[in-house]
Structure formats: structure tokens, C-alpha cells
């Protein structure tokens, strides 16, 4: 009798546990639908949604339902064991997990509303201190956001408590179990297929944000097992993994090759006897979407547009990353990315050569001007390893300079805006010697939260710009959702105009070459295509120019240093290493559209999923045809997809080998050896 009684008690408790587990999951589903409704109305007020956004949200609800039934199967056993141990503990822990998931979903919806992006493994590419700075600069959680979270948590707790009175029948329980196990056959559909969507925002809107973050986190810490050695053996062919063929030196140094970069710049310049000063202005978030002729959001950089007409102008330039962390290694060293970005390797960065170190050996003095903390993204570590002479950052600015305003009183600010950065640089350069210079500027204002000096003035300038473009009221409403973004662009444009007005007063102006480019596009307004985030301009301006030109050929940040070195070597009698590890082939001076390169991208730290190969782009397993103005159209061609994926995998293998084994350059090319 005792045995029968215990078995019956166990059976009854198990049935009770199953029903309680199902009840909480059904309430979880109700909350997910509630959050989807909130998401639609919140994002509709915050950003410009796709025309079919309601349909996308309904598709998202379908994916949420499938996700929930999948999770219900995987969590069932541990939850039932916990229920049998302690009903109270089960309610507490599983209730907490539901609250955590919903809280994460709300927070990530707000992140999407601010950035138009999903948060994934790029989170793990930043230190805790850097994450705090990013969140603080964006204003953190506002009171309204905090109140919303409190209301949701209170609602969830109330529902969980009241749910104890809900008794579900056997039919509901059986149906839930059958549907849950059936859902496992469709597990791969819990995340949408990116290839089915016309825009990245449409995909992001449909995706469950919390599930994306948690599943990405799991894959980050438990990646699919792949032997680096076997990959290398399989893909290594001795051919270039990055476009036009290089003459490689040795498989021990995967990227080392003879430098045959042609000088495409020299013919446009009046060459004097003095070595020119080189000034690089790297503009935070300067995308082609809102700068230059043909900008699809209309141009908000009138002065820069006028400068393009007096310059060598490349309209189809690709950055190598969707954030700032890779811009210095790419522009000044044409370097690979390692696992999470070249500079992210910190003290373990492989030995390399760069424009900074090469010019230092040839008599140049280098300076880096930045209005923030150069420790961010390991910029200072990278620049010091490249033997930069002087680094001027935010802490070096005096009391006469004023930081950009924080989003809320007493909050964090990234540092000083462009006007102050340029002003500080003239103060520093007033004491510069007669040696030729390499001056590097990295700006800050066009960065979330886009709080700038004279905000009201530039907000009015945006309104004037909207009227000048003859936008109707409906268009103006959409543009006003990103009013601070556009205001920050106009602020930069004015700062650049003042910079050149002041520079013209300097004696060395006539012997200076200016390079202006963006590090990537803003994430808001929403990115139109998969390649849009990387699309930036390049303007090379100088009083030394004897002719101007506009080029439509596709080039990248990786091409800058090879071309500058070829220019200096060919026109100023300077000798440089005959072998180099650069990924870029140099700038292409074709005036019509073409792409002769293969370019890998590191979208965010920990995300190397984009690769362009001549007229084709792959993003994960999607294949796109690339055409004029960097338009992309998704196509199906399994043979071509496989061919390009092999090239991409070879690059990724070479990339890890060179970076993890310090085999980018031999000892003979290292800075201390050559001195």
C-alpha cells in the first residue's frame, strides 16, 4: 500500500507540475504578444518603419509562438524536477526567468529604436567600462523607460500570482504537449531567414530580440567545433583570398606579398621638392546616404559637397567595419581583423607595418587628435604600437574648451566636438617644427546621442534644409524622428568649413594633402541595405592638385595606405619595403562603376559575416548581385555562392593564422629591426 501510495503521490505531483508549467508558459505567450503590441507602437513613434510593419509584427508573433513551444520542451525536464523538489522554488525561479526574458525584450526593443540594430555578440567585444560609457552616453534608462519596466514586472508578478488559481484541463495539457514536441521539427525557423526580407530593419523587426541575444550568446561561448588546421589545409591554394592576385612570399606569412601597387594619385598633383604634410580627417558616421551628390536621404553636408568638386572624389568607398573599432588599422595598416578586430587584441596584436610607422622612419612626425578617451576600442594601444609621436585626446584639452552636452544633466559625454578638436589642433600645430607631418583627426559629434553645442540652432538648420528639399509634411515628420542626427551632420559640416578657412592662413597649407572619409554610416536613420552600413565617401583635397576627378569604382579603407605609399615612393624618391602584408591593392581610378576587389568586413566585434567579391556580396549564406551605386539584389546561384564562400573561409583562416601566431610580417620588417 505504501509503495502504491508513493507512486500515486509522485504521479499526482507530476501531473500538477506539468499543468503548472503549461499554465506559466501560456501566460508567457500572452506577455510576448503584449510586448509585440508595445513594440509596434513604440517603434512607430521612434523610427521610420517599413510599410508592411504590421505584417512583419504578425510574422514575429508566429515566430514567438514557435520559439516558446521549442523552449517549453527544452526546459520541461529541469523545471519538473524543480517542481517536485519545491513548488515554491519552481514558481520563484521560472517566474524570474519569464521576467528576465520580458525585461530583456523590452530593453532590446528600445535599443532597436535607438540604433535600428539587434544586439548580439558585439556586446562581448567591449569591456564592462566601455559598455557603461555607451549606455551612459545614450542616456541609459530614462524615467519613462524605468517606469515602463516596473509596470511590466508588476504586471507579470501579478499574473503569475493570480495564475495559481487557473486550472487547465487535460485536453489543453495534452494539446500543448503535442504541439510542443511537434514544434521541434520546425526548430530552425525560430529565427527568420534574412534572405526573405527586403531590408535589414524588416528582419530586425520580425526577430525576437531577446531570443536573438541569448542564442547568439550561447553560440559565442559554445561555437561549432571547426579545426583551424583542417580548414587551412582545405582552403589554402596559394591564391589571394582578397581579390586581385598578389605574388605571395610564403605560406608561413599568409598575407605577405610583393608590393606592386600602382601610383594612381601622382598624375593629379603638382609635385614639389618638399615632402607634403598628410592630414587624415576620419569622420564619425559620415555615410554616403546623407552626404554627396545622389545621397538617397539627401545631402546634409553642403560645404563638403562643394569641396568634392575641387578634389579627387570616390563616391563608392567601403569601410571595413560597421563601427569605429577597425577604422585605424584598416586605413593606416590595411590589416586583417583577428577574431574581434585588430586593435582588440591589445598587447597581443601581431607585429605590423603601417603608414604611421613607415613615415616615422622617413622623417615624418605623427599626431592623433581626438576629443574623447583614446583608450576606447584600444585606439591608444594600437597607435603606440605603430610608434605614433603625439597623441592629443580629451584629457589634454584645457578649461577654455567645452565638452559636448550630455543627454541629461550630469550624464556621460563622449568628449569634445569637431569645432573644439580642430581649434585644439591649431593650438598644438602652432608649435610644430619644420618636419613633414602626418596628422590624424577622429571626430565625435555624429555619434549617439547626437548632442552637440548650439543644438537649437542646428535643429533649425535641419528644418531649413528639409524645406529647401521641398519635402512635404509627411516626409518632414519622418525626418524629424532623427532630428539630432541630422543636426550633428550640419554641425560637423560647419566645423569643417571653419577648419579649412583657418588652415588656409597657415604657411604650410599649400603643401598639404587632406584625406576625408567616414568610419561607417550611422545606424539611424535605418540602414537601407546590407552594404549601406559600410558605404562612405573619400575626398582627397589639396592646393597641390592640378586637376580634379570623380571616381565611381569601388574601393575600401584597405586601399588607402597602399596608394599613399605608392604615391610617396613614386613622386618623392622615398624607399619603402618591397614586401608588405596589406589586404588592399590601392585605390582604383576608374571613373565608371566597377569592382575588381574582394573585401572582407567585420560588421561588429565578433561578427565577420560579410564579404564582397567583385560583383557579388555574401552575407552569411545570402548572395547578392552588386551593381552601380552599390545597389544590391538578392539572387540564387548555389555554384557562385559556394565559390565565394570558399574564398571567404580562406580569408578567415589566413586571418586567424596571421593574427594568433604573430605571422603577419617577418622580423626583417619589424620597426626596431629596421631602425
Where are these regions (language model features)?
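Transmembrane and membrane-interface helices of multi-pass
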Residues: 2-231, 673-675
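Intrinsic-disorder-associated interaction segments
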Residues: 3, 7, 11, 15, ...
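Alpha-helix capping and helix-coil boundary motifs
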Residues: 5, 9, 46-53, 61, ...
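Generic detector of well-ordered alpha-helical segments enriched in charged/polar residues
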Residues: 15, 19, 55, 129-132, ...
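Generic low-complexity, intrinsically disordered sequence content enriched
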Residues: 122, 164-166, 235, 243, ...
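Extracytoplasmic/periplasmic/luminal assembly and interaction segments
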Residues: 227-255
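Solvent-exposed soluble domains appended to multi-pass membrane proteins
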Residues: 252-675
